[in-house]
UniProtKB/Swiss-Prot annotation:
<comment type="function">
    <text>Catalyzes the transfer of endogenously produced octanoic acid from octanoyl-acyl-carrier-protein onto the lipoyl domains of lipoate-dependent enzymes. Lipoyl-ACP can also act as a substrate although octanoyl-ACP is likely to be the physiological substrate.</text>
</comment>
<dbReference type="InterPro" id="IPR020605">
    <property type="entry name" value="Octanoyltransferase_CS"/>
</dbReference>
<feature type="site" description="Lowers pKa of active site Cys">
    <location>
        <position position="146"/>
    </location>
</feature>
<comment type="pathway">
    <text>Protein modification; protein lipoylation via endogenous pathway; protein N(6)-(lipoyl)lysine from octanoyl-[acyl-carrier-protein]: step 1/2.</text>
</comment>
<dbReference type="Pfam" id="PF21948">
    <property type="entry name" value="LplA-B_cat"/>
</dbReference>
<dbReference type="InterPro" id="IPR045864">
    <property type="entry name" value="aa-tRNA-synth_II/BPL/LPL"/>
</dbReference>
<feature type="binding site">
    <location>
        <begin position="149"/>
        <end position="151"/>
    </location>
    <ligand>
        <name>substrate</name>
    </ligand>
</feature>
<dbReference type="GO" id="GO:0036211">
    <property type="term" value="P:protein modification process"/>
</dbReference>
<dbReference type="InterPro" id="IPR004143">
    <property type="entry name" value="BPL_LPL_catalytic"/>
</dbReference>
<feature type="domain" description="BPL/LPL catalytic">
    <location>
        <begin position="40"/>
        <end position="218"/>
    </location>
</feature>
<keyword id="KW-0963">Cytoplasm</keyword>
<comment type="similarity">
    <text>Belongs to the LipB family.</text>
</comment>
<dbReference type="GO" id="GO:0005737">
    <property type="term" value="C:cytoplasm"/>
</dbReference>
<dbReference type="GO" id="GO:0033819">
    <property type="term" value="F:lipoyl(octanoyl) transferase activity"/>
</dbReference>
<dbReference type="InterPro" id="IPR000544">
    <property type="entry name" value="Octanoyltransferase"/>
</dbReference>
<feature type="active site" description="Acyl-thioester intermediate">
    <location>
        <position position="180"/>
    </location>
</feature>
<keyword id="KW-0808">Transferase</keyword>
Length: 221
């Protein structure tokens, strides 16, 4: 359990999962979101997991950012309700799905996106790495390389989707897309700065940073 200075009613259920198919995780998020719309007093949730190789496209994203025929892809492709363009998930990338009731935090989507970035920036600081924000863009960069992508969906101020931090993934899948539709910014992973780093060790720091940034007490579930 990671404790913050907030009272116990600010519990957040932590689900530390391993490799999970994308559609299973998506259905789980939708179920948790619906429960919290119907019962607003339910606790916040943070899911941490990894996905098998999969491409996802935001609700308004363009197929022009795929460098292959989507009808002949070796990996799954799913168009989902988050914002943003195409991104790639695979093992070695730590994905976080917060299901938060922003009525208990702040009803401000820009604030929420900046808070998610702050979580990643604090994790990088543990390794003496300086994460950067870029004007008008969402995500976190290291020395000009994007190491964390963020895309969210909010319904009645309940959040779903979240962040994807490249820890030690096979980066070849990114070469088949224009990640997040950004043509002039390369993608990076923490392993390029910290050889041997693993998602397991990074999970601990993500949990700590998330608790601090959102003022929550994370409870293993």
């Amino acid at each position: 359990m990671i404790r913050s200075n907030k009272p116990p009613e600010n519990n957040c259920l932590l689900y530390n999962k391993g490799l999970m198919p994308y559609l299973a995780a998506h259905a789980w998020q939708r179920s948790l979101l619906r429960q919290r719309i119907d019962y607003p007093n339910l606790e916040d949730v943070l899911i941490l997991l990894e996905h098998p190789p999969v491409y996802t496209l935001g609700q308004g994203s363009s197929l022009e950012f795929l460098k292959f025929d989507p009808n002949q892809s070796e990996f799954e492709i799913h168009r989902i309700e988050r914002g943003g363009e195409v991104t790639y998930h695979c093992p070695g990338q730590l994905v976080g799905y917060p299901i938060l009731n922003l009525h208990r935090h702040r009803q401000d989507l820009h604030w929420y996106l900046r808070q998610l970035e702050e979580v990643i920036i604090r994790v990088l600081a543990v390794y003496d790495l300086k994460g950067d924000r870029l004007p008008s863009l969402t995500g976190v960069w290291l020395e000009g390389r994007k190491v964390a992508a963020i895309g969210i969906k909010v319904s009645r101020w309940i959040t779903m989707h979240g962040f994807a931090l490249n820890v030690c993934p096979d980066m070849t899948g990114f070469s088949r897309i224009v990640p997040c539709g950004i043509t002039d910014k390369p993608v990076g992973s923490l392993a390029q700065w910290i050889p041997g780093i693993t998602c397991e060790e990074v999970r601990v720091h993500v949990v700590q940073a998330f608790a601090e940034v959102f003022g929550l007490e994370l409870v293993d579930s």
